[in-house]
């Protein structure tokens, strides 16, 4: 069973050792970069979460508050180590994250930007209910802006 856990002095080295395929490196920060972003965005309630399966760290996510219109949770980074991809862990972890944020209830939606060529990521986000907003960010014209709305 997938669990989301806080990053701390006991598990951060496991997270830093995570890796993705060479192609995916074009879409994601390195794990140490994700942890660093969490620190940089700490004033925006940034949270870096380890993704664990049966106690083993298999991925990492970074979510922060986005207080502009529309105010929402901003899923900045989401990665599953290449050894654990295509096993349903990403979908399950994403669902767990959405449940956690929904219970928190600060915002009505979650935003994520995904590179148009990252088909497997796009499928995963759409599978759990994210929808393309049609918005194209001038700073990231190769990305689709997807939004998940809580009921």
What are these regions (language model features)?
Residues 2-83, 96, 100, 104, ...:
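Acetyl-CoA-dependent GNAT
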Residues 55, 59, 90, 129:
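Conserved phosphate-binding and hydrolysis motifs of nucleotide-dependent enzymes
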Residues 70, 88, 120, 141:
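Residues that form or flank phosphate/diphosphate-binding pockets in enzymes
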Residues 80, 86-99, 123, 127:
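Conserved acetyl-CoA-binding loop-helix of GNAT-fold acetyltransferases
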Residues 87, 104-108:
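Short coil/turn segments at alpha/beta junctions that flank glycine-rich nucleotide-binding fingerprints
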């Amino acid at each position: 069973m997938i669990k989301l856990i806080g990053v701390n002095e006991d598990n951060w080295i496991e997270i830093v050792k995570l890796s993705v395929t060479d192609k995916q490196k074009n879409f994601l920060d390195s794990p140490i970069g994700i942890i660093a972003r969490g620190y940089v965005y700490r004033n925006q309630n940034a949270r870096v979460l380890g993704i664990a399966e049966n106690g083993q760290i298999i991925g990492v996510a970074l979510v922060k508050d986005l207080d502009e219109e529309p105010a929402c949770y901003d899923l900045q980074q989401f990665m599953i180590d290449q050894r654990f991809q295509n096993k349903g862990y990403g979908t399950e972890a994403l669902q767990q994250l959405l449940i956690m944020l929904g219970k928190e209830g600060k915002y009505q939606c979650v935003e994520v930007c995904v590179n148009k060529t990252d088909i497997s990521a796009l499928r995963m986000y759409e599978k759990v209910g994210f929808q393309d907003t049609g918005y194209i960010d001038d700073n990231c014209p190769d990305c689709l802006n997807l939004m998940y709305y809580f009921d």
